[in-house]
């Protein structure tokens, strides 16, 4: 009977302290090889920077740094009343006092369909191309949720809901008296307006407002200010022409944990994204892919 000799290998011989683990290189990895994950910081940072520069909430409100999805902080409730912080958390105060509150971040998701050839881009090429589109989708959705309570608002509160609840509304044309009366609604609560939320379609209406005595216009088109206060223009069809919002936006706080998650899908039918004829986009039939991006953000109304 023949015996088979076994070759003894010294595995240590093949090991080397000089061998380094492979490092992910976004310039060499193709998107079809990395269809989901957490976006690298070098792409996350400029996207969030663009979001913060363009979001009306972020232009007007105060930024509160967040390391995780929850942030405890203290603020000065400078008058008795109710303060809303986070989703449905109502804090009642009977006197001016320091209040402890918790701000929680909730996920906002956006879906962007693109042609299938994008899968042949490198990771770097893909996200360089998609950065402005992802940022625009994020800040539009954030503002529509936090200001107008649109798009499955995850925060539980919005400026529109606060207006509806307090019924602090002036109805009528854009006149100097109505603008003054609108600001006076805040002054009744010992608050001062510090900005207006409008839209570009309102500019022609604002330019017609004239002081009946001095004949001066209270809207400055060069500085985009009304009655000396800055005007920011929200791009949303849900804010109608002839609607104008004012407030003390120092009471508005927001936070953004610094993570964006993404996933690419090739087969779904997108019920929220429509073709020109109104039919849902079918990725498989139309030879497209869609990237879904999620990021967490929070809003607190004091």
From Swiss-Prot:
Keywords: Capsid protein, Coiled coil, Late protein, Virion. Residues 175-196 form a coiled coil. Residues 1-14 form a propeptide. Belongs to the HK97 phage major capsid protein family. Assembles to form an icosahedral capsid. It is found in: Virion. GO terms for cellular component: viral capsid. InterPro entries: Phage_capsid, Phage_capsid-like_C. The gene is orf47. The keyword Transmembrane does not apply. This is Putative major capsid protein.
